[in-house]
């Protein structure tokens, strides 16, 4: 068994939606990023890579590489899974916490879980996503961006 932790942050910028867990969520801002800015999938990818001792997403998908400009983070997550599987691991479970003052995540969490489970080739009950605020404290509380913490458990079958 191996565990990994991932953390990612993206700041808000111009836009009319954000993408989290593969779900497009209407919002008065977008997230600034080289890829599609899916901070949830980036944190999950880092957790999986960390658990398998494969580095981080910056190593695998550098923001200096034009090939990843606007990249679909679901495709990146599936690529990460393939690397993890190549080392003989399968996903035991993943758990993520979205830290954001807005928008409200509750209406979107079940769809996020379903998409993540599909991409990771696991059952829905092996994926947990939750959200919290910082009670208007810090950069997330001032609605300057979104942060996500994620953990992953990998097992060898």
Swiss-Prot record:
GO terms for biological process: isopentenyl diphosphate biosynthetic process, methylerythritol 4-phosphate pathway; terpenoid biosynthetic process. InterPro entries: MECDP_synthase (IPR003526), MECDP_synthase_CS (IPR020555), MECDP_synthase_sf (IPR036571). 4-CDP-2-C-methyl-D-erythritol 2-phosphate binds at residues 8-10, 34-35, 56-58, 61-65, 100-106, 132-135, 139, 142. Binds 1 divalent metal cation per subunit. Its EC number is 4.6.1.12. Involved in the biosynthesis of isopentenyl diphosphate (IPP) and dimethylallyl diphosphate (DMAPP), two major building blocks of isoprenoid compounds. Catalyzes the conversion of 4-diphosphocytidyl-2-C-methyl-D-erythritol 2-phosphate (CDP-ME2P) to 2-C-methyl-D-erythritol 2,4-cyclodiphosphate (ME-CPP) with a corresponding release of cytidine 5-monophosphate (CMP). This is 2-C-methyl-D-erythritol 2,4-cyclodiphosphate synthase. The lineage of its organism: Bacteria, Pseudomonadati, Pseudomonadota, Gammaproteobacteria, Pseudomonadales.
């Amino acid at each position: 068994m191996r565990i990994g932790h991932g953390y990612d942050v993206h700041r808000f910028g111009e836009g009319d939606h954000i993408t989290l867990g593969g779900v497009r969520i209407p919002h008065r801002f977008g997230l600034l990023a080289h890829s599609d800015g899916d901070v949830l999938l980036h944190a999950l990818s880092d957790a999986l890579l960390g658990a398998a001792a494969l580095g981080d997403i910056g190593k695998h998908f550098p923001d200096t590489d034009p090939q990843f400009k606007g990249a679909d983070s679901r495709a990146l997550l599936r690529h990460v899974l393939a690397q993890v599987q190549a080392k003989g691991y399968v996903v035991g479970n993943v758990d993520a916490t979205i830290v954001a003052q807005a928008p409200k995540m509750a209406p979107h969490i079940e769809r996020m879980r379903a998409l993540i489970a599909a991409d990771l080739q696991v059952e829905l009950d092996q994926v947990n996503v939750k959200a919290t605020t910082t009670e208007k404290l810090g950069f997330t509380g001032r609605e300057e961006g979104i942060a996500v913490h994620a953990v992953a458990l990998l097992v060898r079958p």
